[in-house]
């Protein structure tokens, strides 16, 4: 069996694509190729072939490289094609026409209509129409794929009426759940992932301002690990930091390697997931909360169901109103004042990951999908 994985909007070394799925599939396949934006034309990493295409500068650029990625995909003559970005649906069936015996999997990371609806990159006058077009075209074309994988139940529900071959592969962490008490805590709070206003970045700064006004927390340290989602967000946050004298309290690392993210989490006391109540965030499950839990740090997260249910199931953190910076600040202080509570919730998080919310069970589902499509016996 030969597998070809396609992406236009992610790094070939994206956590879900490379570290989780591709590495798991090595258990049943020794010929895996990932084609995606990369500055090297060809490289083999951990036995997986990486074939680079030019990195698009923006969303529009991702559409311009569609023909190229499909041409390269067809050259692979793979048995199973697995693609990860919405725009590829418009060209993916060319693979079927050239290679009628191949199987095609669409991996839906997001609720794309909601994503467009809240996107600052889509001009407001055409946002509603674009949302409708994305919704209708995605469902219509997806009927023709052999399998649809989603990252959560809410997105799966969109596709249940158009396909019987839909499965949730949660983006649970692959990190081993280990608490490392030997690492010195350098940061009081961490937020890891893409930094945007919608994900609560400005609310975090407002909470830090409140905490800093208390002499007990004047030296509080907050680290953001990840890239800014868009330039305007960076401008807004930097302006707020400057106007409120928070330069000594806030650290931005930018994008860091997958393995380094874990080191920052170990060096932090509390993990934040303060996503604002946008429609998309009532459906999608943020991966970062599982990664915090796997490192034994309590989670302070928004009240939306995909976040709340994982926090409350194991008492691994505190649920807050993300629109209320006072609520955020008070609950950060509550944890910082109580080391026993931090330890208790951190230990609960490790238990949750070890027993339930881990990649191992998702790996089994993924491999079974490939076995069915590839005609591989379970014996």
What is each stretch, according to the model?
Residues 265-282, 297:
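Acidic donor-binding loop of glycosyltransferase active sites
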Residues 232-234, 247-257, 264:
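Active-site donor-binding acidic/aromatic loop of nucleotide-activated sugar
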Residues 154, 172:
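Carbohydrate-associated surface elements
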Residues 4, 149, 181-208, 222-224:
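Conserved donor-binding/catalytic core segment of Leloir-type glycosyltransferases
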Residues 23, 66-74, 94-98, 112-114, ...:
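Membrane-proximal helix-turn-helix segments that form the acceptor-binding/catalytic region
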Residues 327, 334, 341-356, 365-368:
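A short, well-ordered alpha-helix in the C-terminal region of glycosyltransferases
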Residues 37-40, 221-236, 254-255:
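Glycosyltransferase donor-sugar binding loop
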Residues 313-314, 318-325, 334-340:
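Conserved acidic donor-binding segment of nucleotide-sugar-dependent glycosyltransferases
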């Amino acid at each position: 069996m030969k597998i070809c994985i396609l992406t236009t909007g992610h790094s070939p070394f994206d956590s879900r694509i490379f570290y989780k799925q591709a590495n798991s599939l090595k258990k049943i396949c020794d010929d895996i190729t990932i084609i995606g934006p990369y500055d090297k034309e060809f490289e083999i990493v951990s036995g997986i072939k990486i074939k680079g295409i030019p990195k698009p500068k923006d969303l529009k650029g991702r559409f311009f490289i569609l023909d190229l990625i499909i041409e390269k995909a067809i050259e692979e003559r793979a048995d199973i094609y697995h693609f990860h970005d919405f725009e590829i649906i418009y060209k993916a069936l060319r693979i079927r026409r050239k290679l009628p015996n191949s199987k095609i999997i669409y991996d839906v990371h997001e609720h794309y209509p909601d994503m467009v609806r809240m996107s600052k990159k889509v001009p407001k006058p055409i946002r509603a129409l674009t949302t409708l077009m994305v919704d209708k075209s995605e469902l219509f074309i997806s009927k023709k794929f052999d399998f649809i994988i989603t990252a959560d139940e809410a997105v799966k529900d969109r596709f249940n009426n158009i396909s019987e071959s839909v499965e949730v592969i949660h983006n649970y962490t692959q990190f081993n759940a280990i608490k490392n008490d030997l690492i010195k805590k350098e940061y009081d709070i961490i937020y890891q992932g893409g930094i945007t206003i919608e994900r609560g970045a400005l609310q975090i700064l407002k909470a830090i301002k409140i905490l800093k006004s208390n002499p007990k927390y004047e030296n509080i340290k907050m680290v953001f690990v990840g890239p800014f989602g868009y330039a305007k967000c960076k401008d807004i946050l930097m302006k707020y930091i400057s106007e409120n004298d928070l330069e000594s309290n806030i650290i931005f690392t930018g994008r860091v390697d997958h393995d380094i993210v874990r080191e920052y989490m170990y060096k932090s006391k509390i993990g934040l997931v303060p996503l604002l109540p946008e429609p998309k965030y009532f459906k999608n499950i943020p991966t970062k909360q599982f990664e915090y839990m796997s490192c034994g740090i309590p989670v302070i997260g928004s009240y939306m169901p995909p976040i709340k249910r994982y926090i409350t199931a194991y008492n691994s953190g505190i649920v807050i109103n993300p629109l209320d910076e006072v609520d955020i600040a008070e609950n950060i202080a509550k944890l910082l004042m109580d080391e026993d509570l931090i330890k208790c919730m951190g230990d609960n998080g490790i238990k949750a990951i070890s027993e339930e919310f881990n990649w191992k069970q998702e790996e089994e589902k993924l491999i079974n999908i490939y076995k069915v499509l590839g005609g591989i016996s379970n014996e």
